[in-house]
């Protein structure tokens, strides 16, 4: 029996990015494959006709490539951390229906998926927790969730498309709190500069009636700007379209590679990695 999704619900907001990951898998099979998204979309009762139509436009196809690269980059950093910390906690901040944690499973890490209660309720239906995996309800800005993470073997945290919706002060407070609680841990996430964040914000800020876009988190020079928050932070960044791959695949046009250069360059679309050093 298929899982029915109604229009204008929390469930609907969760399946749109899920559908994007399915489209990525079809358009760029050599670069990205999300078998869980492909399977889940098949198990869901929902009218995808509008999403299907939109997915074929030029900018939507480039948007799908962005999604694919972001997920690949974050997974690369998680796996890289697990090489030196095989028993680490792998923590997906604002998980939605993303299965990156599971796709990085090395057989000994512990996976935590964190999101709001209504999101986790849907996740428990569609993606119930497996071995060494927990779905945890929380508000990321309320640090009570720190106590639920077993970081005795290290901890790598990742957030995909999450911090654009946070105020700069919220991200700073969260990062400093994590540095206190998880020395030796690592946080990786995607970010962009102010111009890009304004473009991202155009749609959702209108509906939220928020006028001050400038208060929302954006970054151009991550090592300099975020590094200044706290002396314990070891900050680096790489372009998220071309920082991990050259995109020289038959499925990616020269025009899309040009757009990727613009994204990484002018828009500072990047993957930021923060290592939490010891107390100073």
Give the positions of each predicted feature.
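Conserved catalytic loop of SAM-dependent methyltransferase domains
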Residues: 232-258
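Short, glycine-/aromatic-enriched active-site segment of Class I SAM-dependent methyltransferases
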Residues: 198-213
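A short, conserved alpha-helix within the catalytic core of class I
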Residues: 165-178
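Rossmann-like AdoMet
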Residues: 1-91, 95-138, 151-152
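Conserved beta-strand signature within the Rossmann-like core of class I S-adenosyl-L-methionine
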Residues: 178-194
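A conserved beta-strand element that flanks and buttresses the S-adenosyl-L-methionine
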Residues: 157-158
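Short alpha-helix
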Residues: 213-240
């Amino acid at each position: 029996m298929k899982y029915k999704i109604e229009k204008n619900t929390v469930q609907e907001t969760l399946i749109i990015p899920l559908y994007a990951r399915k489209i990525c898998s079809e358009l760029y099979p050599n670069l990205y494959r999300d078998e869980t998204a492909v399977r889940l979309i098949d198990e869901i009762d929902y009218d995808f006709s509008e999403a299907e139509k939109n997915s074929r436009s030029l900018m939507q196809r480039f948007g799908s490539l962005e999604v694919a690269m972001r997920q690949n980059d974050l997974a690369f950093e998680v796996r890289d951390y697990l090489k030196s910390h095989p028993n680490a906690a792998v923590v997906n901040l604002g998980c939605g229906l993303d299965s990156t944690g599971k796709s990085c499973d090395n057989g000994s890490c512990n996976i935590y998926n964190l999101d709001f209660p209504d999101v986790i309720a849907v996740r428990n239906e569609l993606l119930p927790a497996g071995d060494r995996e927990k779905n945890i309800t929380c508000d990321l800005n309320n640090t009570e969730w720190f106590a639920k993470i077993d970081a005795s073997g290290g901890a790598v945290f990742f957030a995909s498309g999450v911090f654009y919706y946070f105020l700069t002060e919220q991200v700073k407070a969260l990062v400093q709190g994590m540095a206190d609680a998880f020395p030796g841990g690592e946080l990786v996430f995607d970010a962009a500069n102010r111009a890009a964040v304004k473009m991202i914000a155009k749609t959702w800020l209108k509906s939220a009636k928020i006028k001050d876009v400038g208060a929302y988190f954006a970054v151009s020079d991550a090592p300099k700007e975020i590094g200044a928050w706290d002396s314990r932070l070891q900050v680096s960044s790489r372009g998220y379209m071309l920082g991990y791959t050259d995109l020289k695949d038959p499925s990616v046009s020269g025009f899309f590679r040009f757009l990727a250069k613009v994204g990484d360059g002018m828009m500072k679309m990047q993957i930021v990695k923060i290592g939490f050093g010891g107390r100073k």
